[in-house]
Amino acid sequence: MSETYFITGAQGCIGSWVVKALAERGDTIVIFDRSADSRRLTAIMKPGDIHRLRFVIGDITDAAAIRVALQESSARRVIHLAGLQVPACQAEPAAGALVNVIGTLNVLEAARLAGVERLVYASSAAVFGIGEDDTPLDEGAASEPGTHYGVFKRTNEGNARVYFLTHGLSSVGLRPLTVYGVNRDSGLTSDPTKAMKAAILRVPFHIRFSGATDFQYVRDTAAAFIACADRAPVGAHVFNLHGETVEVASIVNVINEKAGQELVTFSGPPIPIPSAINDAAIRRMLGNLPSTPLEVGIGETMRQFVELREAGRLDTSEIETELRAGGALAR
């Protein structure tokens, strides 16, 4: 039996893969997004699946607009992925809070008023701040975020808990770290995916951070969001998502090996987020979730980029921008 899902930020990276997976199994999808730009959806979805989507243009900072859209959708499940990334929140904290905190409150309130069954939202491993050692952190580890983005995400977790305690709205916040795959094209941790794209274009690329990070294939991330929307128990839950904890050097080696050239380099400080997180809690609740090995995920991503290039549909705008600016190019 198909379900109706209301999705914010559906035209972002994780959102596009969530939509793809839901569409392929025949669910009804209502997309609430401030942009009509569907290039990320068209990059990974079949035209027939895209034609079945319902689009509502709107901004999560507009409380009335999202209330009306969610009510009219008759959706029982909400997946909230809209938000600004770390650089935008650091550059303009007030604007970041308006979108990431007030916008999320608007989604929570709209979900309460619409009587939805469950809301799943994107939190982040950025809530932890910098880890003191390499020990994988569980959900109860101290929350000392080192970015405005991390503070905003931690605030959202608290607000979701209050909405359950006060109104009985069930929710799940998921904390991914470094997500990679087709459509990951914004934010500092998008550099590895951009490097994969640059490599198939035979363009040098420089990743702007070093150290270890928890690296998860976007298809697996999307599957976790959908599993929580479908099966999470009543309550206000927060779970870590874990892929593989690897050194950036290892990622670079895999990309260069698959490209057959030494095109990708890296340097810079580690990202201010723990390098390893523990996902035992979500696996206890939901059982086994997809976990694509790093080399397989990188290989699939690079093959998808090649297929898009050969079809004349590969978006290279972010690579071209950095070519002109000299930003993340190999130095």
List the predicted regions and their residue ranges.
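Short alpha-helical oligomerization interface
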Residues: 88-103, 137-145
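C-terminal substrate-binding subdomain of Rossmann-fold SDR/epimerase-dehydratase oxidoreductases
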Residues: 208-211, 215-331
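Flexible, glycine-rich beta-alpha linker
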Residues: 128, 147-148, 172-190
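Active-site Tyr-X1-5-Lys
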Residues: 130-133, 144-172
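Conserved NAD(P)H cofactor-binding loop of Rossmann-fold oxidoreductase domains
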Residues: 81-85, 123-124
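Conserved Rossmann-fold NAD(P)-dependent oxidoreductase catalytic core, especially the SDR/UDP-sugar
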Residues: 105-148
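Glycine/proline-rich active-site loop of Rossmann-fold NAD(P)-dependent oxidoreductases
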Residues: 154, 167, 180-193, 203, ...
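N-terminal Rossmann/SDR dinucleotide-binding element
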Residues: 1-77
